[in-house]
Amino acid sequence: GKEFVAGTNIKKALKNTKSDYQKGYCFSYDMLGEGARTEKQAQEYLTSYLDALTALKDIDKDKPLLERPNISVKLSALHPRYEYLQQDRVMSELYDRIKQVAMLAQKYGLTISLDAEESYRLDSELELYAKLISDNDFKDFQGIGFVLQAYQKRAIPTIKFLINLAQTFSKKIPIRLVKGAYWDSEIKWAQMEGLSGYPVFTRKSHTDVSFLACSSLLLNNTEYFYPQFATHNALTASAIITLAEKLGKEDAYEFQRLYGMGSSFYDQMIAKRPCRIYSPVGSFRNLLPYLIRRLMENGVNSNFINQLIDDNIEVKELLKNPIEKAEFNIETSRKLLKLPQDIFDGRVNSLGYSLGNKAHMKSLKDRLAQFQNQHYIAGSIINGKVLSGKSLEVRSPYDQNQLVGNIALANYDDLNQALKIASESATDWRRQSVESRAKILENMADLIKESEVEFISLLMREAGKTLNDTIAEIREAIDFCNYYAMQARALSEPEKNQSYTGEDNYLSYHGRGVFACISPWNFPLAIYLGQVVAALVSGNSVLAKPAESTSIIAFKATELLYKAGVPKNVLQFVPADGKLFGEVILSNNIISGVAFTGSTATAHVINRTLAKRDSPIAKLIAETGGQNCMIVDSSALLEQATDDIINSSFLSSGQRCSALRVLYVQDEIADDLTELIKGAMAELQVSDPNLFATDLGPVINQQAQDNLNNHIKLMKKKAKFIANVKIQGSKTGFFVE
């Protein structure tokens, strides 16, 4: 750790960097930390930045502002919710903290730089930075710097945005240009979130070209910028020196290197050109994430230093024009790293949303508005006809005063009619080619994407889901359609098995007949469709019974299935009372199989009902509840463990079988982890799921609310109460505190 960290505190760092200071280096000090999870941590980081500025106030007091020490500020360390969905809090709470740091820097004649982090935070950072630059309290201060990552595809547009900012407010912005240190995370995040492309360049040569392009733009605009080029690549540094000399800007920039790295190169240059050392400061407890990034960055084969000492790589290869390398790599880039939508062989990865993109979020909010007050009329769909009858009001679980629509449940006669039609259509549907059935599922996937804004609205209004949960569920529904289409094709051809001489044995798969699909309310779109499309593509006709609490969502999905090409006599939509459905449908000998997601107790009832019949054995596919546990030992990074615990516990308001129920923690870390969890819970917002900033919505209904409140009362008597999340939502909703 001592190799890469200047000291455990700012005073030790000043002592340890004294020899480099005497060589002529300037310094930028970074308070190590990977981002606050709690308000307490944020305040501690704020104090560390203020203390560091105070410790530096008397160093090089007579030198110009940009030659004095600098503090690098990690915005995520100053606020536990530094993300665009929490932008209102960012622009008030986080802004007040970074302004406090900037005011002290201005008082002492020092500079600060806002460190670059993950790409999903960029829009939020730019908005915050613009507010800082335009603040009248900094009218005459030129010491608020910005860090730009060259691997970001938005690097050039960001520079142009900053030029406009500098022009408007008469600023000269110190701008540190780096390659970028979160590449692996950016790639994985883009794949998991289903982005249309990667926010960063995927080839090192492309990042190298971007770095040079950004360098050129910065050097051509030194009236607005003081460029600070952070590189250990000798070829890149040489190109910058040459370009600066051509432009007559030899004294208009500086280089930067990391503490513990690049000394042999920059020690040769320091007499001619200014160089600043980026110097991490902090305890070894906070070192690991930073150290891993450095090791990953410098351990790869494409690293300049590694290539320089590799006897198998000729020097002329290192000196090759990076533009030529980039052009050569254009064709191979996508082959080596597929786009997020193409990472799965045989099917596409569903598209998601970049929730940190300001334009995307504004567009989504505007489009959602058209569905906010829509009233839905739904009912059973038998042989393609929507049946009317006595209907139930469907009210939103977050506000019982809001009417979502009405649903007419199927009665005894409706269920018998649906069963008859499904039975009559089963043989013809089974004879349809697998390819034609699979194509219908892929059509359905496309139709869901086209209707996703309405589904987001419905999932919020009828199921009480937050924005993150709705997007995840819609993507899961799309993935189900594409996945089962792929699997059906893979299993469509008979498979020849080993056999005796003169004998041929084949294994082939066929539809069984009529399937009953019984889905839950906690995933009213994804699981409903997952059950139904799997049964359909396998050649079965289907009776689909959704949960009564979320039947409108299933109704809209069923309408899309017909539009996608499912014959109206093959799929019957029958929202019904559970007991009645069991008596009429599940006890009937026509039923060949049941797909069920719900409680273990109900699964046992279904199993017994099927077993009592005097008919061929029906298949029961049951997905039931359980106790999900997590074990955390002392090897875990507690901040990361806290993130996982919060997500597992509270996504979908904890209403999923995979939600964390029991946490086992090693004694030695239990107190520290408990404090982190308490602090992270205090930052969660329990409110109206229509608000993008909401983290937890309501539970589904009054019964669920009562059950949870009763359990909380019981546990408060039997166990030690640690923390709960405060409600900010409507008093007429089913919220749990």
Residue ranges and their predicted role:
Residues G1-L351:
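Positively charged, amphipathic and often flexible ligand-engagement surfaces
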Residues E3-K11, K15, Y21-F27, R37, ...:
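Catalytic cores of nucleotide-enabled group-transfer and carboxylate-activating enzymes in metabolic
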Residues M460, A488-Q640:
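Rossmann-like NAD(P) dinucleotide-binding subdomain of oxidoreductase/dehydrogenase enzymes
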Residues D30-L32, K74-S76, S113-E117, V147-Q149, ...:
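Generic beta-strand/beta-sheet core signal
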Residues K563-G565, S587-N589, G593, T600-E737:
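ALDH superfamily catalytic-core signature
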